Amino acid sequence: MVHFTAEEKAAVTSLWSKMNVEEAGGEALGRLLVVYPWTQRFFDSFGNLSSPSAILGNPKVKAHGKKVLTSFGDAIKNMDNLKPAFAKLSELHCDKLHVDPENFKLLGNVMVIILATHFGKEFTPEVQAAWQKLVSAVAIALAHKYH
């Protein structure tokens, strides 16, 4: 289990409270699909993913990105208990969707980039360290059900 200090929790929640989940979620998932094109195979039903502009303008990408980022909100509420909080999502992604758990790490890294672009100087090294710790812990929690 990962332990978050009071300072780390404050750094994460402070930035999260200013986050536009819809905008940043679509941006994060879109960036994942552009930068790591092999991840597109999990989103066949999303329609046109033929170019970066098609991906970033795709309403299904934006909607699912919002859903993904909303789950990060759940992570923030359950920072001290991530594995149980993500048990159902882990099972879904493992047993039903067969997502390579390495993709969770990639998405976490993309999330950190999105945060840096959105928050600039507010995204200090200390804030980045707290967020990097969180996205890594979420990736581990999501990979928990994998064999």
Swiss-Prot record:
A single cellular component GO annotation: blood microparticle
Repeat recorded as keyword: no
Tissue-wise expression: Red blood cells.
GO function term, MF aspect, one: hemoglobin alpha binding
UniProt-annotated binding residues for heme b: 64, 93
Pfam families named among the record's database cross-references: Globin
Biological processes annotated in GO: carbon dioxide transport; cellular oxidant detoxification; hydrogen peroxide catabolic process; oxygen transport
Superkingdom as given in the UniProt entry: Eukaryota
Keywords: Heme, Iron, Metal-binding, Oxygen transport, Phosphoprotein, Transport
Domain Globin residues, every copy: 3-147
Positions of modified residues (Phosphoserine): 14, 51
UniProt function note: The epsilon chain is a beta-type chain of early mammalian embryonic hemoglobin.
Quaternary organization: Heterotetramer of two alpha chains and two epsilon chains in early embryonic hemoglobin Gower-2; two zeta chains and two epsilon chains in early embryonic hemoglobin Gower-1.
Family: Belongs to the globin family.
Full protein name: Hemoglobin subunit epsilon
Originating species: Homo sapiens
Gene field: HBE1
